[in-house]
């Protein structure tokens, strides 16, 4: 735990000021000035308290030793087991820039469209359970260098004939992609991490454990080799899009598929950095059903896997069905053509409602 040099109070990372704040005397400090000592800067490890859920086995860690009384992964309300441990130091971190209140506001805005969600998910006490967790990521630096030859063609019509000229387009490639990121935690579902992406890696800062004060961090248990091919493939997609849409070729169109351009990129992974990215995390548990709401701690982007309240669903269906029944019986004679049109309108409304809900 970080203590205030002025009064001995607890220091936490304050998102609004991007500095360390004393909870007692309100003094601010630079996170990098609260030293672990010069030897610690060269160390590959740092001290943490690891909290383990006795029910699901999920682990989070913190530089604080305060008691964690619920699990963010399975939603269990239980005191987590704790132990002192050492963790490998990340190279970089993206500090939280969205406060808990920002996070709650974004979540409430999304929940206005969640008509069939259980009312508990809109309760202020429940929403206050958002927990700030730094999720581990691997950030890949991919380079593409060397000569490349692409095929192109240009067609023109003369009378009744179309003439096509074929070209070899020669160039030297020098592309650098830094910060292609994939989450490094098996407990953090890839679908969730993709839903709240991207992060702006230009705002990464050098890591110091002070950034974790007042927050938690997940442990990295997925090796960097798992996503190497995905990183190379993603870099290839970016190069293909750029070559296809941004390079002027004088009317010559590329005669190359995405896969062939990727194969000619000579991609190499230059380096892989261990990083931490900020996520506001909220879990909901009802019997065996666990649902999550996550907010990108840098951009405020929200993603949620929301359960459906059966009671609200049937109530909403009844409210919709009754006026339709009255309308059809009082004002229309049900003929095949009328019925077909009514069904088409209802289907269109249903599709619109469905699309609006799946984008939550």
Feature-to-residue mapping (PLM):
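Short functional micro-motifs and their immediate structural scaffolds
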Residues: 10-12, 30, 61, 79
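Extended hydrophobic
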Residues: 273-324, 351
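Conserved small/polar residues in nucleotide/adenosyl-binding loops
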Residues: 358-360
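Short cysteine-rich clusters marking metal-coordination/redox-active sites
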Residues: 4-7, 22-25, 53-56, 71-74
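Charged, low-complexity helical/coil segments in non-catalytic cytosolic or luminal regions
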Residues: 86-289, 311, 315, 333, ...
């Amino acid at each position: 735990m970080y203590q205030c040099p002025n009064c001995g109070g607890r220091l936490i990372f304050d998102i609004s000021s991007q500095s360390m704040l004393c909870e007692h005397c309100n003094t601010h400090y630079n996170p990098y000035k609260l030293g672990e000592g010069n030897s610690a800067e060269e160390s590959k490890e740092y001290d943490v308290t690891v909290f383990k859920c006795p029910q699901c086995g999920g682990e989070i860690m913190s530089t604080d030793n305060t008691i964690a009384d619920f699990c963010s992964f399975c939603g269990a309300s239980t005191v987590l087991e704790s132990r002192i441990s050492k963790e490998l130091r990340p190279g970089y971190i993206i500090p939280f820039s969205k406060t808990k209140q920002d996070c709650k506001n974004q979540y409430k805005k999304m929940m206005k469209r969640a008509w069939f969600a259980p009312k508990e998910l809109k309760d202020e006490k429940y929403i206050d359970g958002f927990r700030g967790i730094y999720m581990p990521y691997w950030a890949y630096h991919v380079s593409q260098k060397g000569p490349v030859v692409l095929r192109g063609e240009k067609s023109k019509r003369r009378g009744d004939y179309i003439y096509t000229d074929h070209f070899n387009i020669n160039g030297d490639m020098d592309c650098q992609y830094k910060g292609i990121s994939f989450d490094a935690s098996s407990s953090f579902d890839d679908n969730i991490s993709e839903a709240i992406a991207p992060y702006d890696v230009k705002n990464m800062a050098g890591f110091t454990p002070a950034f974790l004060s007042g927050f938690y961090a997940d442990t990295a248990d997925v090796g960097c080799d798992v996503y190497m091919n995905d990183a190379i493939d993603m870099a290839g997609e970016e190069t293909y899009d750029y070559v296809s849409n941004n390079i002027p070729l004088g009317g010559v169109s590329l005669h190359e598929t995405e896969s062939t351009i990727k194969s000619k990129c000579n991609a190499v992974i230059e380096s892989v950095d261990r990083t931490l990215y900020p996520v506001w995390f909220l879990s909901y548990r009802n019997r065996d059903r666990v649902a999550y709401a996550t907010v990108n701690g840098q951009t405020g982007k929200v993603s949620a896997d929301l359960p459906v309240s059966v009671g609200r669903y049937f109530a909403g269906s009844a409210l919709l069905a009754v006026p339709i029944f009255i309308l059809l019986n009082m004002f229309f004679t049900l003929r095949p053509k009328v019925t077909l049109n009514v069904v088409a309108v209802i289907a269109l409304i249903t599709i619109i409602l469905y699309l609006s809900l799946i984008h939550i």
